[in-house]
Amino acid sequence: MEEIRSARGRYTLYGTSACHLCELAQEMLQQLAQVAPGFVYSAVDISDSEELFQRYGLRIPVLTDQRGRELDWPFTPDQLWAFYRS
């Protein structure tokens, strides 16, 4: 997994390539990146890891930060912004 940093730390979006909700979450993250300079994230396909699949399989998409906080779907742009700002 490629490590990416922002001014507020590292973010990871867990999902799968066949997940429509994950695509919606990625669109929201891309919109956030346009208004929050320095915000970047990495997307991880949980189907590549049994451990990640067991942890996130029924909850994807899930966004995590370097502090271990998790934002589960469904989330709104406002909730995403609040997660980023806190």
Residue spans for each PLM region:
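Non-catalytic, surface beta->alpha helical segment in thiol-disulfide oxidoreductase systems
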Residues: D65-S86
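Thiol-based oxidoreductase modules, predominantly thioredoxin-like and allied folds used
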Residues: G38-E50
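Short glycine-biased active-site loop of nucleotidyltransferases that positions the nucleotide triphosphate
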Residues: F53-R55
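Local sequence-structure signature of Cys/Sec-based thiol-disulfide redox active-site neighborhoods
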Residues: E2-V35
